[in-house]
Amino acid sequence: MEPPPPLLLLPLALLALLWGGERGAAALPAGCKHDGRARGTGRAAAAAEGKVVCSSLELAQVLPPDTLPNRTVTLILSNNKISELKNGSFSGLSLLERLDLRNNLISRIAPGAFWGLSSLKRLDLTNNRIGCLNADVFRGLTNLVRLNLSGNLFTSLSQGTFDYLGSLRSLEFQTEYLLCDCNILWMHRWVKERNITVRDTRCVYPKSLQAQPVTGVKQELLTCDPPLELPSFYMTPSHRQVVFEGDSLPFQCMASYIDQDMQVLWYQDGRIVETDESQGIFVEKSMIHNCSLIASALTISNIQAGSTGNWGCHVQTKRGNNTRTVDIVVLESSAQYCPPERVVNNKGDFRWPRTLAGITAYLQCTRNTHSSGIYPGSAQDERKAWRRCDRGGFWADDDYSRCQYANDVTRVLYMFNQMPLNLTNAVATARQLLAYTVEAANFSDKMDVIFVAEMIEKFGRFTREEKSKELGDVMVDVASNIMLADERVLWLAQREAKACSRIVQCLQRIATHRLASGAHVYSTYSPNIALEAYVIKAAGFTGMTCSVFQKVAASDRAGLSDYGRRDPDGNLDKQLSFKCNVSSTFSSLALKNTIMEASIQLPSSLLSPKHKREARAADDALYKLQLIAFRNGKLFPATGNSTKLADDGKRRTVVTPVILTKIDGATVDTHHIPVNVTLRRIAHGADAVAAQWDFDLLNGQGGWKSDGCCILYSDENITTIQCGSLGNYAVLMDLTGTELYTPAASLLHPVVYTTAITLLLCLLAVIISYMYHHSLIRISLKSWHMLVNLCFHILLTCVVFVGGITQTRNASVCQAVGIILHYSTLATVLWVGVTARNIYKQVTKKAKRCQDPDEPPAPPRPMLRFYLIGGGIPIIVCGITAAANIKNYGSRPSAPYCWMAWEPSLGAFYGPASFITFVNCMYFLSIFIQLKRHPERKYELKEPTEEQQRLAANENGEINHQDSMSLSLISTSTLENEHSFQSQLLGASLTLLLYVILWMFGAMAVSLYYPLDLVFSFFFGATCLSFSAFMMVHHCINREDVRLAWIMMCCPGRSSYSVQVNVQPPNSSATNGEAPKCTNSSAESSCTNKSASSFKNSSQGCKLTNLQAAAAQYHSNALPVNATPQLDNSLTEHSMDNDIKMHVAPLDVQFRTNVHPSRHHKNRSKGHRASRLTVLREYAYDVPTSVEGSVQNGLPKSRPGSNEGHSRSRRAYLAYRERQYNPPQQDSSDACSTLPKSSRNVEKPVSTSSKKDAPRKPAAADLESQQKSYGLNLAVQNGPVKSNGQEGPLLATDVTGNVRTGLWKHETTV
């Protein structure tokens, strides 16, 4: 075979070369990608721009260089797990320009690791674990332009690290531990010399340089001076360890390595710990990790009881020291426990769990969003309370100081106490504190008083300044308010921090500072404290008499003898005052309309020198005399063991005001100088002792001593004492077995309780009567609701007044009493107004005709609307008042009763109550005028039912005009209310009048003092009795239905027979054209109109059934025998005038004996026929037939009959209502009378009749009927029966016994 020609071998060689190159380029590690992008033309240019990406492949080491293309330009090895770069890791990649090693685990870079990368321009080592770097690491990177070392562990960079990087222009080395100290001073010079840009690199430590650019920090701030701040320093475990004897416990300590002389030492309770195998303690020497951390370990292999204590890791350098500690608690195998316990204090409610002995338990403080920043430890997690359980299993020390106060008052006062004060804001802050201490009576925590005492001391520093003149006045007012606090709270505050003594001493300094500023007289007064100060000369001093008094109204002077008993605290909101003159008698001090609280006589010898040689100097001396009077002894509580003192171990109590006298200035010996003091007692007791208060007794707590004092004179209310030196004077008495008469504990006069109980019993009788006998009492549903609610709210007012008006001792109870009185009073006058409006609507109501009879009637208005007015409006008013400030209710400091503050009561009570009362009076006047204009309107009648309304409309054309003067005959069962409008008006108006008078007399009885309180108590009792009698007579005794209901209940035997009411001798005939009057009786008879002039004879006859004949026979024959007189004409609700269109009550029309209707019965509505036949069938079992329904058979039946008859009549009525659609009846006050929606097929009559139509009876009356005295009598329901142009009056039938008959097709017998 011949060899191939040379020309053919050349193409084959080129193909082999290309195939080999492509093979080499494709031989990459699994997962790596080769990216070649040509920027020019030619295959060589594409290969030179090669890019290899080996990212996120979990590579543990750098790929061998021989696995990568020799012409690789960019190598991406990010997001792997490479931990070390060895020497020559990238040899052979001489064309590599970019190397990305981000997000690996590189902790060590060997010298020469980047050797051979002479073309490398960008190197990224971000987010690795590099702890230290040196110059050999970057050897060979002569062309490197950009280097990023951020996110590593090193704290600093040593000088010379970048010496081999001659082309470097951009550097970034931000880390979390970067320490800007003296070790990076070289970088400032190197950056400036090489013109290098340092990007996004800021200091982290020390804290003073945090967030400042490294190259922007001033060089003088880059120091290595103490204190030492370590970027990283931690000890594990870091929290308290609780272990048992014999356990093993390892510790490890690690810190940032910043200096070569760093050492790590271990300590126990301040003693250095070294390895001791006998005790099982092993200490490892300090070791350096990754050039950035220094670490040491301690192991306690056999823990004993002596291991309990504080163990610490101590880092020591020449730049300073730093320590981390952990507490170890070693328990015995049989350790005890502290039991779980609940602790409630002024910091909150803490529930301590069961805790091992020797352990300190911690609990989070109660969270409170307000004022959290003013407590130590701003973070909520740092605010914890702790409590230690000792080794005996008992709770020991505790600390709640980091927790906020749970009470709002205490928390606000604490905020006041933390406010910085200066001359500018002192007065304003004092005024704010004064406004807050007005409610000092509600202080419940001793810290409240302590904080106020501390604030008064702070204010006292500024009383010397001329700009703070009024500061002293405000301080006295604040101290006066503190005297309103409870004695127990003041006692605890005195024992805890001597708060009361500090307040009194601050008040003494006020006068001293004011007189020192140049003033000759200074005085300030408050309700409980009076302060007076003078600058006096010894020369010419002849003595001084000063009196403390309080002005009172002239009306109160009659009660001076009883004043002390009624008002021990003197909280009349009237200031105490001083009156002084140069005299030793009281003759010139009598002031009109004042109460003398105390007086003091200073003798002329007070300022006299003892020796003659001192006389001349003493005459020219100036003295500062100050007098302070306290209304009571609350600021002088004895807290220590005072058994041997004047109070005899708290057996005696201060019962008089306290008056303080002090002289400042030149040295004066005030001992052995008799001072007479007269004091008014505010309580009665025994074993009186005159005493002085000494601030130095009982280790500075203070106490009363009786040395040098005696009682000169004493009567019921006044005690005069004499003491041998100046000081604080008072009288102490034993109150054991006696009562300190306070307004909170006072009782009302017995006549108030007696008469109030009478009123309560009468109101209960009315309420029970109307609720128990509701179905038997003739009263409308609306009036019933109004009366019951009115009586209930009067009863509520009386009960709360009598039982709670003086309960001022408990603030919450007192507030509740004020709220209930506020509500019940407004509700009472509102229910009177609702009642008056209802009467007015009934008096002026007119019948309204609906425009569209096919439209269904409007639904009835709910009874709830009255409750929304009578009860809802007072609830809203009280709710708004209480929500605005609950302290609007309760006892005022000046009032011994529970009510409201004066200002809020004007808008929340007196204003609304006066307006509602005025509106009520306007309603009463309007009703009175209407009744005078229309005397015929006397009674409220029942609202007609739907059937009655239609029948009334059909009968409207049959009224005889010739007898227009005749009035309707009305049965008493058609009355909606037994009381006439005039009687209802009288009842409502007198109820309101008596209630207002009763309220006023009660208020006077509790607010005035003797003897006026006694007078108004008797007035209150008289009004109570009158009110009781009126309510019983008007609503019970004067009402026949209520009397009968009680008689039937008390005497059940009397209910077996019927009782005739309003029966008069019957009239045999009518006179003057009037129909004979009739009403219901026990026989429940009907009457017909016998007037011949009212009707004409009919020209046609009417077919009568046997039922109708029997009824006609009964009316014509029985009337003269058993007729009852008709009600007075005034019983009609309104006149029948068609022009006035007044609403007509349901009237029972008598059967017309000669009815001549012209009706086509075939045209009667089938629906009506079916309904009426149903009624007929239902009554077939109960109603007598034409034979049995005669008068003779019907009369002997009694009204009660049997329950079976009543049940059958009710079933008949309900059956009729079920088949006949009947819309709900509208409210009588606002509804319009409408016709039923059912079919009304009426055919016009062909003739008229002059006689009366068949009688009509309302469905309601049929339901009430219990006696069937004669045959069935159904009303005509299919249209009016036309008369001959004249209208006859509607006559009343029997209301309780008769079922009417009408004209029926095929009607014979039942």
From Swiss-Prot:
Has UniProt tagged this entry with the keyword Transmembrane? yes
Q: Which residue ranges are assigned to the Extracellular compartment in the record's topology?
A: 28-747, 807-815, 887-908, 1007-1013
Stated membrane topology is: Multi-pass membrane protein
All copies of domain Ig-like, residue ranges: 231-329
The segments labelled Disordered in the record are 1065-1084, 1187-1208, 1221-1264
Q: Which InterPro entries match?
A: Adhesion_GPCR_A, Cys-rich_flank_reg_C, GAIN_B, GAIN_dom_sf, GPCR_2-like_7TM, GPCR_2_extracell_dom_sf, GPCR_2_extracellular_dom, GPCR_2_secretin-like
What Pfam families does the record point to? Answer: 7tm_2, GPS, I-set, LRR_8
Q: Which GO terms describe its molecular function?
A: G protein-coupled receptor activity
Instruction: Report the residue ranges that make up the LRRNT domain in this protein.
Output: 28-70
Q: Which GO terms describe its biological process?
A: cell surface receptor signaling pathway
Main location as per UniProt = membrane
Any idea where this protein resides?
Membrane
Q: Which family does it belong to?
A: Belongs to the G-protein coupled receptor 2 family. Adhesion G-protein coupled receptor (ADGR) subfamily.
Q: How does it assemble?
A: Interacts (via PDZ-binding motif) with DLG1.
Q: What does this protein do?
A: Orphan receptor that may have a role in planar cell polarity pathway.
For this entry, the protein name equals Adhesion G protein-coupled receptor A3
Q: Which organism is it from?
A: Mus musculus
